[in-house]
Amino acid sequence: MTNIRKSHPLXKIINSSFIDLPAPSNISSWWNFGSLLGICLALQILTGLFLAMHYTSDTATAFNSVTHICRDXNYGWVLRYMHANGASMFFICLYLHVGRGLYYGSYMYTETWNIGVILLFAVMATAFMGYVLPWGQMSFWGTTVITNLLSAIPYIGTNLVEWIWGGFSVDKATLTRFFAFHFLLPFIIAAMVMVHLLFLHETGSNNPTGIPANTDMIPFHPYYTIKDILGLLLMITALLTLVLFSPDLLGDPDNYTPANPLNTPPHIKPEWYFLFAYAILRSIPNKLGGVLALVLSILILVIVPLLHTSKQRSMTFRPLSQCLFWLLTADLFTLTWIGGQPVEYPYVIIGQLASILYFSIXIILMPLTSLMENHLLKW
């Protein structure tokens, strides 16, 4: 008699995806982040569901309902801060996951990669709409500034902004629809994750060498389930440390002031995980140019597979490309820092130089360096 996990219609899908799945024997801890992202998503959906039970999406009561959750609902403060800081953990894992893909050439699986880029956009949209819901000062003004960017689109811009707002300014209609979309999108993301995995399992995982590992595979369970649990414990430890010791470390103090359309905060800035894109947006003096640069800063990931000129897939044996990769990483840290600074000398020029470097590395320097490495290896 065959094992039920191999014969039952539902159990065998789970079995072939998480238990008997053949995985390369040499994948490192950089391959942990996929499972961590899945756990982050589940955590966000669960905490979000319980928060939604107490939250009211009305401009008059939204701020007070969040206060009520923190003060009166049983362990409401844990739910609220797990959800807020869970988003930060989500983005840390996301950026490391994308970085791993860039370093080891995982983007050569184009379907998996492109769905991943769409997922990144979807998560960013969800996080942006979630930031609006507490209806604090930064919620209100952040939304006003970012949605207003769409007015830079020729002809339809102004109408589009008013259509998204549901009026002539960010108001009750905006808050209600953002709550609806913030609730809906994670479930769409979960469905897209399934498609992401479906395409990944068509090809199998990449590995640090970038060489096909078909001759040396091991079952996912128990080897990588145990390995992933270690990553999970480290992430949960970091998250709980953040939630229980300094839950507001990554937030903005301005968001503890109820939204006031008549009083603009001195420095409007998004959450830390959007600061690099915000810095790129601000580095271009033209509104439409800034918006295009903002979108391209993420959309550039789609053309990465087209710009792959190396004869090797991974960067493991390519020291020059490695230098560029870590320069890009440092550049992203610089952009994140600049995004949180006021628009004044010397931050403006640093932001502009960092933005130029960001696009130069990805579009020009990486492909040229790869060609040079091919030549040096006489390939």
UniProtKB/Swiss-Prot annotation:
InterPro entries in the cross-refs: Cyt_b/b6_C, Cyt_b/b6_C_sf, Cyt_b/b6_N, Cytb/b6-like_sf, Cytochrome_b, Cytochrome_b_C_euk/bac, Cytochrome_b_N_euk/bac, Di-haem_cyt_TM
How is the cofactor bound, as the UniProt entry phrases it? Binds 2 heme b groups non-covalently.
Which spans of this chain does the record mark as coiled coil? none
What is the protein's name according to its record?
Cytochrome b
UniProt: heme b b566 binding residues: H97, H196
User: Which family is annotated?
Assistant: Belongs to the cytochrome b family.
Q: MF terms per GO, please?
A: metal ion binding; ubiquinol-cytochrome-c reductase activity
Species assigned in the record: Myotis albescens (Silver-tipped myotis)
